[in-house]
Amino acid sequence: MNIRRAHEKDIPRLIELLEQVLQIHADIRPDIFIPGTTKYTNEELAEMIKDDTKPIYVAADDDDICMGYAFCQIRQQPFSNNMVPFTSLFIDDLCVDAKTRGQHIGEQLFEYVKNEAKHLGCYEVTLNVWSGNTSAEKFYEKMGLKTKERQMEYILM
């Protein structure tokens, strides 16, 4: 397996994997997510691939087929004046193809992202997990992540 930055040729495969992630979220929150859609379009992915502040890392097999990805964003913190300034690498989305889960691809991808964050001078790696996505929560806890903050909601409908 080779972990590298995404290329434009990866876009069709990224779309397939984005569909898998969307379905997980739609199963958890059908009131918010629309099945059969994706978070990004082909055009948006093409722009993101060129943007060094939004690196997309892919785990490719020996045939250079993308088996998983990590969409990342470099963010400057803080959100307010009462915090020390620092750089954070936010994982916007991480996915491993359902057919290849359990082969430690996600672990290798996450370790790669952590090393990239160190190389970029980041203080931390952060991400969000939807409540109800217990397999993702368990995976990230296994990788050493701890809850930083919780966002709560009250649905009015």
Locate each region found by the language model.
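A short beta-loop-alpha structural element at the N-terminal edge
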Residues: N2-L17
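Conserved GNAT-fold acetyl-CoA-binding loop/helix
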Residues: Q23-L45
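A short helix-loop-beta-strand connector motif used in the catalytic cores of GNAT acetyltransferases and
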Residues: E43-V58
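Conserved beta-strand in the GNAT
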Residues: V58, I65-Q73, C95
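Conserved acetyl-CoA-binding loop-helix of GNAT-fold acetyltransferases
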Residues: D93-V96, G102-N115, K142
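Conserved active-site alpha-helix within GNAT-family acetyltransferase domains
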Residues: E107, E111, H119, S131-E149
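Conserved GNAT acetyl-CoA-binding A-motif
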Residues: K118-N128
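Conserved beta-strand-loop-alpha-helix junction that forms the acyl-donor binding cleft
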Residues: T126-A136, E153-M157
